[in-house]
Each structure stands twice: as C-alpha cells, then as structure tokens.
C-alpha cells in the first residue's frame, strides 16, 4: 500500500480508535498514531488491516478545531489530500482543510461513508437490519396496535372497550363492569395502547391500599408496564432527587389514603403533569351536593388537571343515582353539573332503549314504530334505511345494525360509561358449594372459654374476629409449643380430600400467612403432598415461582396455599377446586376469594369446599353467606349493602356463636332484602348500555383478528435471529418454553429488558397464561421493541459486502442493494406512524441504474450470497469506489418518485381518516352532549399538525450492500 506521512487511515478491526495518522514507516512496516485515544499501532505495509479515509465533494467534514467544511473539491498534493469548500460557521468559501488537520474522533454514520472507510458489517447483520425495518413498519400499520401484546385471554367485551377508548384523545370514561369481568384488564389495555402509541407518557394509578400490589403485579405481568409504588418512605426518598418527587417516575401507583392525607403531597401530585389518571374502586368516593368527602375532593382536584381519566367502579345501580352522577361529574363537570337535570335525562333514554330492543328482536315494525325510530334518530334521508330494515331483503340485517349504531351514538352516556354484566357475557362456569360440618375440638373449646374471660372488655367486633380463627386463639395461649394442626379436624379433612383427589389442582385460601405456612409443612411431612405457598411476605418473583409450580401439569404442586392478601390479583383459571380453610369477614373478600377461579375463561364448574367448625363464628358466617346472601353459588352485588345494614346484629352472633335466638329471622330478612335488591337491579339494567359495552359481532371479529395475528411465524424467526446476532443464549426447555440468558459476547453489555439471570419466554398465549414465570413474546414486548431500537437506532448492519456466485453474469459485475427509509419527524403523541411509519424502500441497482428489486425478492437473493471478510472487503471497495459512487447517484434520482408516492398516500389517508372522524363527532355533537369540546379541538389540532408533519417528510439512505459477481 502507498503510505505517506500525515495520511489518515482507519483500522478495519478497531474502528473505535477513530482516525489514525501515519507517523512513521520503513520498508516493511508503518506506524499509525490514533490521537483520540493516544494509542499507536504498528502494521505490516504489505497487508495491513487499515483503510484510507477519503471524502468526496458534497460531504461535510469536521476540523480538529471543531468547525465544519462542506466539500466542493478534493485535491492531492504529495500523496496528501486537501479538501476545498465552504466553512459552515462563517460561510467563507474556498477554505482549505488538509487531511492531517481532520478531527480524529470522526464517526462515520452514513452507510456509504462507513463502507468507504472500511467499516463493513457482517452480512447477517445487514439482513437483520432490513428485516427489522420491514417488520417494524408493518407492525406500526397493523390494526389493533397495543391490544396484541398483553398476557390475557382474548375476551371480546374487554377488547371492544379497550379498542374504543384506547384510541381516543385523553379518554375520560367510567368502567363499571360487574365483578369478574375484568375492569383492571380493560384499564391496562387502554393504558398499554395509549403508552405504546405515544398518546400518553405519564400515568398515575390511585387505588385502595390493599390493592396496590395487585395493580403493580397485574401491570407488570400482563402488560410489561413497570410502575413505581409510592408510599411515605418512597416519597421522602424521592424528595432528595427532585423538588416534586412524583417527577422522578413516569408510571406511578399510590393509595387513595396516601394521596389525600397530606396537602403538600396532593399539590405535588396535581403539579406532576400526568397524561392519564386511573382510579380504582371509585364507588368509595362519597359525594353529596352539600358535603363531598375529602377523598372525593382530592380526586376532583386531580381530575381537573389531568387530561385523561379512567374511573373503575362497581355497577352504577348498586350505588344509587346520586352516587353514579358524582362519578360522571368527575369526568365532565360541564356536562354533568345538575343532578335533577341528569335524573330527568336518564328517564328520556327509555324510548331509545326500547327502540334498540325492537330492532334487535328482528320482528317486523309497525308504522308507529317506524315513525318513532325516525323521530329518535332525527336524521334526514333515513327513510331508505328504515324501509330496508323492515324488509325481507338481504340487506335488512345490515340496515338494522346501522340503525342500532345510530341510536347508540345518540344515547346519553354511551361514550363515557361502559358496563358489562354476567347476563350479557357468556363463558362463566357454575359454582357448587360443599359445606363440611366438623366438631369443635376440646382444646379449642378451652382456649375460647379462657379467651372470653380474659377478653371480656373487647368490642363485639374484636371478639367476632377472634372467633373466626380459633387456631389463632389457641396459638396465643400455647405460644410456639402449640401444635393446633395435630387435632384440628379441618386439617384431617383437607389431607383426606387431597389424597383422594391427587390428580386435581386445588386452591386453598386462609386468612393468615402463618396458617398457610403451617399447613404446607403438615401436608408435606405427613402425606408427601406437593404444596406451594403464596403469601404477602414473599417477593413478586417468589410468588411467580410458586404460581408457576402450581401451574405445571405433571410435576407441579397439587395444591396452592394462599393467604388472603397474598392471593390478591392472581387468577388460577386452570384449577376449579377451591377450599376455604376459614371464612373472610365480609362478602367483598368472599367474592374476591371465589374470583381467583371464577373468571371468564374458566373451563369447569367451580367446586367450593368449606370445612367449618360447629359452635364457632365460621358456622354462623357460612349460613349467613349461603342462606342469607346466596354468595357462594352466585355473585352477590347486594352483599355490601346488606352487610352494612345487618352489621350490628351479625357481629353479635359472630362474637357469641352459641347464642342463636333470632338468627333464623336475620337470615330470612337478609334473604328478602337480597331478592328485592336483586330484582331492583335487574329492572334498572340499561340494556342499551350493555349492548354498546359488549360490542356484539364487532367485538367477536376483533378477538378473532388478534388471534390470527398470534400465529405470525415471522415473529419467531425474527426473534431467534435477533437473539443470535445480539449474542443472547437460548435454551429450548420444551413445552414451547425457551430460557434466554446474557452471554459474554453481546452486542451491548446490558440488553434492555433482559434480566442478569435471564428469563423464560414463550410465543404461545395459552402457555403464557398458565405459566406466570414465562414472558409472552409478541411484537409489542419490550424485548422485541428494545431489540428493534438497538439495531435501528445505531449503524448495526448498515454497510456490507457480499459475493454472488452466478456464471450467467460476467465476473466482477457490480450490484448495489440500497435500503432507503421514508419518514417524517413529529412528536410521539401525534401518532404519525399510523399513516407513515419509517418505511423501507429497497432498490437493487446495476451500474446502468436498472432496479431489479421487483424481480429479485430479498430473502431468496440473500440465500444466494456469501460473506466476505472485512479486510478483503476493504480492498474490493477501494477498487470499485468510483463505480459505487456513480450507482449511488442513480439511486438518489430514482428514490424520489417512490418516496413521494408513499408520502402522498400517507397524507391522503391521514386527511380522510382524521377529517372523517372530526365530521362524525361534530355531527353527533348536535344530538349527544357527551362529546366534549376539548376532544373536538384536539382532533382538529392533531389533524393540522399531522398534515404539516407529512408535508415535511423526507427520505435517507439507511443501509447498503455492495455485491460482486464471482464464478468461484
């Protein structure tokens, strides 16, 4: 190689050294100094792994003093290059810059610069980069983005609500599904969509204290959303890092009590500029016209400041009209400002609901009914639609569906309130109760008697709680030496039940963690029963492992022993046997226990076993729950109301179980109250709202479409390719499970989303649902999204050289494969990727500029090519540099037409879609006041900004591959 002192070269094998300068040479060796690192390298002159750095007219270069030069001309003087051009900071022309004075930290970012500088990537990395571009672009445009990646069953009514609400600007809605229908999952899906699309970045979730960990677990395990839990300690710590502690995290969960308790803390919460606020158990926010509660006022303050609000609440009818109005008032105080007016309005919706019922029944409509429909809809040109709906023509059903849709749009609260009921949703199992009456051991009788004497001053409530758990009373007196499990007949019964049902999975729930731990030891030591334990003292990872062991079919635990708090937020639909070792204090907790198994998607009827001790509070409670509330075999929406009204009497019976006088009357009166309230709820059902919330056929199709996308084999192939190239170890464990672990030779030292000790993954939704320790990999999973970002945000795979063995072409024939990206820059919240995601345009050019890409498909072509090592590649590039420059010029002239077509299509699609949405809502605004002005303004502003951004769209070369034909 011809070396001259002062020339600039770059190392082919150590490009991180930057630009080197020739500082010494003799007949056989050359020495390069790399000023940016201060290191020297000695190379053999004849075959050194270095590439001469030469820039061309049109390039911009940086001097060692930091100023930049746009090159107009390149001269050579005594073997050294001199660049002549315009200095960018002073705009001075004819400025010269000798190559020896170039900035040594020069980074080659353009693919062509990297190629000419000898920074040649492996061929498989180029292929991965192209696939990453192609798949990322496709995924951005796929329908239902944000709904495909969560670890949940594809349940139509949940998907319907999430799809409707998740795409809105700053949604403000009330989610009021009945228990067991998945409000938390619906909220999570909405959050996931909003965060993934960029519509929201900062989210605050406020929940009752007992549900904080449940939400934390659900958001992480189901949606891969890592929330920070703020309590007093965390808040104090964060004060050291920021004036407003809540600005240290993007996603925050805190309790309602924590938010309300301290005035400054509430101010900090209000000032933290959240995009979305989620409030669970919103029915506990007490409001009246004269005296709203402090909790209500705290949430009201936040709701005034946060653009998007999701309130999760029990069914509205359970709580009374005023309570329901109070929640709607939080969502839109301008619209819901007068309670009397609201009550009147609700009455006026009855004809609308009747009209919908009429259409759905499918019967022929009378002239009066047709006229009533016309009046209700109030649209011009509705006559043909009414005639079609009332005919025997093929389009009759479609016309009826359209009329129902038009009525829905005019229905008062359909945009702000969603409520599904078990009556309207199929897929729930039956619940069967099996009570087992057992004698009270003498040891317990003695302990209870002594406790009664010593605790005479205790309140009735405290005595009632004690009487529910006689083993705790006994243990208190006996201390560590007390072995209640040796004589408690419930333990004997449990062991007998488990040994006679060894093939069945059984969930056992008890109130206390200590009880669960003691039972596990007894079952293991006495009968060798495999039992996993699950309690609040365990970390999330430990609970995951316990749940996974329980979920394993053949080698897993037969029984899972849960404490009351430990089981929150976990569902075990694969089991259908529930044993309640004791009973909880109130009907909400009872429903929560049964709800661990009684979820939508449960395949079997649920067998509920309650072994109880006679003459204890358990014997009182089991009768009251079953005979008074029917709470074991059916969900009990009336439970809380009756519990509150019967509380004083019930507590006395629980505190003194032997006093049974009048208990039958209490049960009878509670049952009558239950039946009356239930009938009242049924009568008050809003059928129209249920139809709207349920989604009907549309929701079924949505679930089916996502299920079809689950079968995308491209994902598995791409993910494995990505893991191979990044350097992540993969260990196939069978059962559709793969263990990923970091290796010592990864592309990056710390791959985002991959724990240090690795993780288990699956591509199968069913496996992910039964194995909580396995992460469900989809295109939306952080591992894949981070992998795409890692490849595409850097220069991995952006320049390479390959050989094509093809005797039909002359040896030395050049082809250049160019991958351009057409894109527009815009703030994430505009969601520009719906219309123009970064889109790859592939070209395969010969030296005459003929584009062969349409005839030669990428994957087929890629398989015909072979790799070249970097050193040989650098020599090839130097030999054909001028030809490659010429082909690149031809590519630049051809890309404009393709790019312009893509941009024009995107602009047309965006205008049609956003203008259509705006027109539809503006037309509806006239008949439905629940469409907010700020929502209309946001859509209009969004449309203008999107079109403006698309006008600024451009293109750039993202990757190139030089292909040289050989016959060997």
UniProtKB/Swiss-Prot annotation:
Annotated positions binding ATP: 177-184
InterPro entries, alphabetized: Helicase_ATP-bd, Helicase_C-like, Helicase_RapA, P-loop_NTPase, RapA_C, SNF2-like_sf, SNF2/RAD54-like_C, SNF2_N
Keyword Nucleotide-binding: yes
UniProt EC number: 3.6.4.-
KW Iron (keyword) present: no
PROSITE patterns tied to this protein: HELICASE_ATP_BIND_1, HELICASE_CTER
Function (record text): Transcription regulator that activates transcription by stimulating RNA polymerase (RNAP) recycling in case of stress conditions such as supercoiled DNA or high salt concentrations. Probably acts by releasing the RNAP, when it is trapped or immobilized on tightly supercoiled DNA. Does not activate transcription on linear DNA. Probably not involved in DNA repair.
Family indicated by similarity: Belongs to the SNF2/RAD54 helicase family. RapA subfamily.
Protein name listed in UniProt: RNA polymerase-associated protein RapA
Gene label: rapA
């Amino acid at each position: 190689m011809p070396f001259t002192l002062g020339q600039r070269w770059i190392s082919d094998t150590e490009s991180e050294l930057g630009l080197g300068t020739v500082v010494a040479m003799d007949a056989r060796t050359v020495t390069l100094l790399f000023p940016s690192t201060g290191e020297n390298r000695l190379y053999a002159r004849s075959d050194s792994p270095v590439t001469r750095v030469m820039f061309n007219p049109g390039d911009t270069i940086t001097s060692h003093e930091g100023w930049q030069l746009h090159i107009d001309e390149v001269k050579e003087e005594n073997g050294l290059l001199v660049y002549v051009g315009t200095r960018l900071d002073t705009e001075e022309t004819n400025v010269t810059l000798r190559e020896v004075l170039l900035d040594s930290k020069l980074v080659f970012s353009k693919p062509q610069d990297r190629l000419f500088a000898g920074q040649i990537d492996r061929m498989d990395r180029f292929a991965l980069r192209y696939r990453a571009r192609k798949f990322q672009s496709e995924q951005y445009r796929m329908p239902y983005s944000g709904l495909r990646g969560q670890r949940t069953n594809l349940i139509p009514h949940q998907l319907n609500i999430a799809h409707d609400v998740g795409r809105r600007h700053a949604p403000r809605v009330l989610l009021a599904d009945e228990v067991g229908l998945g409000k938390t999952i619906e909220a999570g899906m909405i959050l996931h969509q909003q965060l993934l699309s960029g519509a929201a970045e900062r989210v605050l979730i406020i929940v009752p204290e007992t549900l904080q960990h449940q939400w934390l677990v659900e958001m992480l395990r189901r949606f891969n959303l890592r929330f920070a839990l703020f309590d007093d300690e965390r808040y104090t710590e964060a004060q050291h890092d920021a004036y407003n502690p809540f600005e240290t995290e993007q996603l925050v969960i805190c309790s309602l009590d924590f938010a309300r308790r301290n005035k400054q803390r509430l101010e900090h919460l209000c000032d933290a500029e959240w995009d979305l606020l989620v409030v669970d158990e919103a029915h506990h926010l007490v409001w009246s016209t004269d005296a709203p509660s402090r909790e209500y006022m705290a949430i009201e303050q936040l709701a005034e400041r946060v653009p998007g609000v999701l309130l999760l609440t029990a069914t509205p009818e359970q709580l009374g009209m005023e309570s329901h109005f109070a929640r709607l008032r939080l969502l839109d105080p301008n619209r819901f400002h007068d309670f009397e007016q609201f009550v009147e309005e609700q009455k006026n919706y009855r004809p609308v609901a009747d009209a919908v019922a009429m259409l759905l029944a499918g019967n022929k409509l009378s002239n009066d009914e047709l006229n009533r429909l016309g009046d209700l809809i109030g649209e011009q040109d509705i006559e043909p639609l009414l005639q079609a709906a009332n005919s025997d023509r093929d389009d009759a059903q479609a016309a009826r569906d359209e009329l129902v849709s038009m009525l829905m749009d005019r229905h008062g609260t359909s945009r702000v309130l969603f409520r599904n009921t078990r009556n309207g949703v199929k897929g729930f199992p039956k619940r069967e109760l099996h009570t087992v009456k057992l004698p009270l051991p003498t040891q317990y009788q003695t302990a209870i008697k002594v406790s009664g004497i010593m605790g005479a001053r205790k309140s009735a409530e405290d005595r009632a709680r004690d009487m529910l758990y006689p083993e705790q009373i006994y243990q208190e007196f006996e201390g560590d030496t007390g072995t209640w499990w040796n004589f408690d007949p419930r333990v004997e019964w449990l062991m007998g039940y488990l040994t006679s049902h060894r093939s069945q999975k059984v969930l056992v729930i008890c109130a206390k963690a200590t009880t669960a731990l003691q039972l596990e030891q007894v079952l293991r030591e006495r009968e060798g029963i495999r039992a996993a334990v699950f309690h609040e003292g365990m970390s999330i990872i430990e609970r995951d492992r316990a749940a996974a062991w329980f979920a394993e079919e053949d080698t897993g635990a037969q029984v899972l022993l849960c404490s009351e708090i430990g089981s929150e937020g976990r569902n075990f639909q694969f089991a259908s046997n529930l044993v309640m070792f004791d009973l909880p204090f109130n009907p909400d907790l009872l429903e929560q226990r049964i709800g661990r198994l009684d979820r939508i998607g449960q395949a079997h009827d649920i067998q509920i076993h309650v072994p109880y001790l006679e003459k204890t509070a358990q014997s009182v409670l089991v009768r009251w729950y079953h005979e008074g509330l029917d709470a074991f075999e059916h969900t009990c929406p009336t439970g809380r109301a009756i519990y509150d009204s019967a509380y004083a009497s019930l507590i006395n019976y629980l505190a003194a179980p032997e006093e049974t006088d009048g208990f039958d009357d209490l049960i009878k009166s509670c049952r009558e109250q239950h039946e009356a309230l239930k009938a009242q709820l049924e009568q008050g059902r809003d059928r129209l709202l249920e139809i709207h919330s349920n989604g009907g056929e549309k929701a079924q199709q949505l679930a089916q479409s996502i299920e079809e996308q689950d079968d995308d084999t491209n994902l598995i192939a791409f993910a494995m390719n990505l893991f191979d190239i990044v350097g992540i170890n993969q260990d196939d464990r069978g059962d559709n499970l793969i263990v990923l672990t970091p290796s010592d030779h990864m592309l990056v030292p710390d791959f985002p989303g991959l724990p240090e000790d690795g993780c288990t993954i699956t591509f199968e939704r069913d496996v992910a649902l039964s194995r909580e320790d396995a992460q469900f990999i989809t295109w939306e999973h952080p591992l894949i999204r981070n992998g795409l970002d890692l490849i595409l945000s850097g220069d991995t795979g952006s320049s390479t050289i390959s050989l094509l063995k093809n005797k039909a072409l002359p040896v030395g024939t050049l082809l250049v494969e160019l991958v351009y990206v057409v894109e527009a820059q815009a703030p994430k919240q505009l969601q520009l990727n719906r219309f123009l995601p970064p889109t790859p345009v592939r070209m395969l050019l010969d030296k005459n500029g003929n584009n062969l890409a349409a005839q030669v498909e990428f994957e087929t072509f890629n398989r015909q090519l072979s790799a070249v090592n970097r050193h040989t590649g650098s020599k090839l590039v130097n030999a054909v540099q001028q030809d490659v420059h010429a082909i690149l010029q031809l590519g630049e002239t051809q890309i404009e037409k393709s790019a312009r077509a893509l941009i024009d299509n995107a602009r047309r699609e965006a205008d049609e879609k956003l203008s259509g949405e705006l027109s539809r809502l503006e037309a509806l605004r006239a008949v439905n006041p629940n469409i907010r002005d700020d929502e209309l303004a946001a859509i209009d502003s969004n449309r203008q900004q999107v079109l403006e951004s698309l006008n600024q769209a451009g293109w750039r070369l993202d990757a190139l591959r030089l292909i040289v034909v050989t016959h060997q």
